[in-house]
Amino acid sequence: MTNIRKSHPLVKIINSSFIDLPAPSNISSWWNFGSLLGICLALQILTGLFLAMHYTSDTATAFNSVTHICRDVNYGWVLRYLHANGASMFFICLYLHVGRGLYYGSYMYTETWNIGVILLFAVMATAFMGYVLPWGQMSFWGATVITNLLSAIPYIGTNLVEWIWGGFSVDKATLTRFFAFHFLLPFIIAAMVMXHLLFLHETGSNNPTGIPANADMIPFHPYYTIKDILGLLLMITALLTLVLFSPDLLGDPDNYTPANPLNTPPHIKPEWYFLFAYAILRSIPNKLGGVLALVLSILILIIVPLLHTSKQRSMTFRPLSQCLFWLLTAXLFTLTWIGGQPVEHPYVIXGQXASILCFXIXXXLMXLTSLMENHLXXX
C-alpha cells in the first residue's frame, strides 16, 4: 500500500508542493519571503474577518465602530493593530520579494513573474481601500485624491470617477462598496497565489547563482520548512514588537480625527508603503502625466524580462549591475522620504531627479550595462 501522502488526490498536491518538492540546496534567506507573504495574507484574512464582525460600513457609524472595536471588543485593539501593522509587514515582505526577483533574475520565469506583478497591483488596491474604511480625515481625503486621479483619463474620466464614487463626492456609497471590495479581494488574491505557485512549480526555484541546480536538489521538508519557520518567528517577533510597543508608529495622527469634507488636512499623504509612488505622481506637473508615471512605476516590472540583455541570469557575478540595482534601491528610499514631505523647494526638485533616475535605471541603464558586462566577461 502506498503512503496516503502520495496517493490521496488532495494530500498529494500538498505533498508535491511543500514536502517532497525538490529545491535547490543553496537558496538563501532571500527565498524566505514567499512563505512569509503567505503567512501575512492568512493573518490579514483572519484578523480582517474578525474586524468585519464588528465594523459597520456607514459614514455615520464607521469611525465610531472602529473606536468601539478598540475599546469594547475583547482584544479588539490587538486585532485592529495586527491588521494595520500586518499590512506594513506584508508590504515590507512584498518589496523585498520583488527586489530579490530583480536581483537574482527570477523574472525569467515570465508566467510566475507576471502573475506576481498582478498580485502586487491587487494587494495595493486592497490596502488602499482598507485605508479608507476607518473613515478618518486621511481615509476620506486619501480616497478623494486618489480616486480623483482617474478624472485625468481623457473623455471618460469624469464619468468614471462619479461611477466609482456612486455620487458626486466620496460618500456613503463609496465607503460601502470599498468595504465590499476590501473583503472580496484578499480571497481573489489567495486564488491567484495558487496560480503563482502552480507556475513556479512548473519550473522549480531559481537560486543565487542563476545557474540551473537540477544536479543538486534537496527535499523541501525538513530543510526549508524549518528555515521558513525561523523566518516566520523573526517576522512575528517584529510584528508583535510593533503592535504591542508602538502600534501607531507607521500610522497618521490625522486618521484619529473623524472625516470632515469641509476641512482639508494640511498634508494629504498615503501610508508609508505608497509614498514612493505618491512622490513620482507629484513630481510631474501635468495631471495625466503624473497618473501615467504612477501606474508605470509598478507596471515597468512587466517589461523587465524583455530588457534582460545579460548572458548571466543573476547579478551575483555582475558588479556593475549590482551598483545600478542598489542605486535604484537608494532612489526608491529617497522617493519614499520625499513623498512624506510637503511640496516645497528642495523636495520637489529632488523628487523629480529621483523619479527620472528610477525610470532611467530600470528602462535603459540596466540593459546597456548588461550588454557591456557581456564583453567584460569575454575579456
Curated annotation (Swiss-Prot):
UniProt: a ubiquinone binding residues: 201
GO BP term, example: mitochondrial electron transport, ubiquinol to cytochrome c
A Pfam family annotated for this UniProt entry: Cytochrome_B
Binding site for heme b b562: 83, 182
Subcellular location: Mitochondrion inner membrane
Domain of life: Eukaryota
Disulfide bond entries: none
Acetylation among keywords: no
Single GO MF descriptor: metal ion binding
Primary localisation category: mitochondrion
Transmembrane region(s): 33-53, 77-98, 113-133, 178-198, 226-246, 288-308, 320-340, 347-367
Co-factor requirement: heme b
Lipid bilayer topology: Multi-pass membrane protein
InterPro entries on file: Cyt_b/b6_C (IPR005798), Cyt_b/b6_C_sf (IPR036150), Cyt_b/b6_N (IPR005797), Cytb/b6-like_sf (IPR027387), Cytochrome_b (IPR030689), Cytochrome_b_C_euk/bac (IPR048260), Cytochrome_b_N_euk/bac (IPR048259), Di-haem_cyt_TM (IPR016174)
Residues that coordinate or bind heme b b566: 97, 196
Extra information: Heme 1 (or BL or b562) is low-potential and absorbs at about 562 nm, and heme 2 (or BH or b566) is high-potential and absorbs at about 566 nm.
Role description: Component of the ubiquinol-cytochrome c reductase complex (complex III or cytochrome b-c1 complex) that is part of the mitochondrial respiratory chain. The b-c1 complex mediates electron transfer from ubiquinol to cytochrome c. Contributes to the generation of a proton gradient across the mitochondrial membrane that is then used for ATP synthesis.
PANTHER family linked: CYTOCHROME B
Descriptive protein name: Cytochrome b
